Amino acid sequence: MAELDQLPDESSSAKALVSLKEGSLSNTWNEKYSSLQKTPVWKGRNTSPAVEMPFRNSKRSRLFSDEDDRQINTRSPKRNQRVAMVPQKFTATMSTPDKKASQKIGFRLRNLLKLPKAHKWCIYEWFYSNIDKPLFEGDNDFCVCLKESFPNLKTRKLTRVEWGKIRRLMGKPRRCSSAFFEEERSALKQKRQKIRLLQQRKVADVSQFKDLPDEIPLPLVIGTKVTARLRGVHDGLFTGQIDAVDTLNATYRVTFDRTGLGTHTIPDYEVLSNEPHETMPIAAFGQKQRPSRFFMTPPRLHYTPPLQSPIMDNDPLLGQSPWRSKISGSDTETLGGFPVEFLIQVTRLSKILMIKKEHIKKLREMNTDAEKLKSYSMPISIEFQRRYATIVLELEQLNKDLNKVLHKVQQYCYELAPDQGLQPADQPTDMRRRCEEEAQEIVRHANSSTGQPCVENENLTDLISRLTAILLQIKCLAEGGDLNSFEFKSLTDSLNDIKSTIDASNISCFQNNVEIHVAHIQSGLSQMGNLHAFAANNTNRD
């Protein structure tokens, strides 16, 4: 009976059910009911504190939880304080990696790249030639297929279920099969060939090249610093310089910088320019088509070459060429869309530049040797001085020959200007003629502003008009922005005309006060780039 008296009454049980349904129990009920749920204390030999084991009922109701069997602690558990994560800005005071650790990582990376497979993986992953860059760095096949299949899909943030639905609609892709790889290689070769045709302006209809990117890279030129893939004994990437371009076989002749590699012929899809390369929109190739040379080209000035050309006899390259019978034809014959005589001059120009480059290299080495001898207070031998003087004299002769060839090439370029989309101009150029007319009007107006002429000498008035015309030409060149070799050389021709009309005693004054300043302005306008060779004073007075 005493045990029955200790059990809770019915009202207490009902109150407990109501409080349990509401989600909380009263503290009084917990204190009263917890005394009945205590279990015996198991004491062991090595257990100092008492461990309380909860009593487990055999049957449980789905309306009750384990909280009824567990002693409820009135004290709230200790909570860990939340630390607000505030993004910190990177400062210079942050700890940097240890130098030894960095060296260790760099050493391991270097050893990794020495492995042939790792080296090839880096090449395949990051090395793209100029002709392949727009093909591989654009949209992949999945993006292109997505645009064609779902043109109204403007977003790319879809759920996994939506992407799965799109993949089921598009079908299962065919990958990693021999037929797939062969098809991809064939498509890549076709795109490369189309880009080459665009670069060489051999396209009649641009609508057939819609599968190409919007920007087409321009072909590399001679003298460009490149990184090329070399195969064979020295397999890898090496830096060098382009010495020749073979458009027929789509290759470049590259001279490598590393000693012992020499010069090799590299395909264009394994040559990458070290500098940012220019591109041209594909639509521009359709707008600037070269017109037919037989119908749309204006009449040319024909040069009458001698019966036996000294170039053919003295040049071993052209003399032994199988094209000799074709090259020795008349000036009206063309080869590759250009006059044969023009191609001969370009070939000779290239050879002269190559020889001049070798002489400059020798001269640079001799200057270094002379500086070493001077620093050691050692005398310079007569043989050394003789060799140095010989190179200087040969360079002088090369410059004269180079100027003659450049003059002929410039004449042909002037004739070929209409074929390249440029407006034909008469010599002297239109800009020079306009500037001279405007200068004469300005000088005439300023001279007669007071009612009577201030300068009565006609020679002085003409000299002032010509000097004013030079200032107007410089102004037009600076404001125009589109500087070409014809307009640039017209400025030099104006200076030469003025120098030929003044007295010999005033030439030194003209050079010190006018010509040298105009030369500085020319250098600033053109940056002495590709126009410098064509802007050189003509020493060919034949």
Swiss-Prot record:
The modification Phosphoserine is found at residues 65, 95, 309, 321. InterPro entries: DIRP, LIN-9/ALY1, LIN9_C. Pfam families: DIRP, LIN9_C. The keyword Nucleotidyltransferase does not apply. One of its GO terms (cellular component) is nucleoplasm. It is found in: Nucleus, Nucleoplasm. Keywords: Acetylation, Cell cycle, Coiled coil, DNA synthesis, Isopeptide bond, Nucleus, Phosphoprotein, Tumor suppressor, Ubl conjugation. Disulfide bonds: none annotated. GO terms for molecular function: DNA binding. The modification N-acetylalanine is found at residue 2. There is a cross-link at residue 21 (Glycyl lysine isopeptide (Lys-Gly) (interchain with G-Cter in SUMO2)). Residues 355-413 form a coiled coil. GO terms for biological process: DNA biosynthetic process; DNA-templated transcription; regulation of cell cycle; regulation of transcription by RNA polymerase II. The modification Phosphothreonine is found at residues 96, 304. Residues 2-296 are annotated as: Sufficient for interaction with RB1. Belongs to the lin-9 family. Component of the DREAM complex (also named LINC complex) at least composed of E2F4, E2F5, LIN9, LIN37, LIN52, LIN54, MYBL1, MYBL2, RBL1, RBL2, RBBP4, TFDP1 and TFDP2. The complex exists in quiescent cells where it represses cell cycle-dependent genes. It dissociates in S phase when LIN9, LIN37, LIN52 and LIN54 form a subcomplex that binds to MYBL2. Interacts with RB1. Acts as a tumor suppressor. Inhibits DNA synthesis. Its ability to inhibit oncogenic transformation is mediated through its association with RB1. Plays a role in the expression of genes required for the G1/S transition. This is Protein lin-9 homolog. It comes from Macaca fascicularis (Crab-eating macaque). The gene is LIN9.
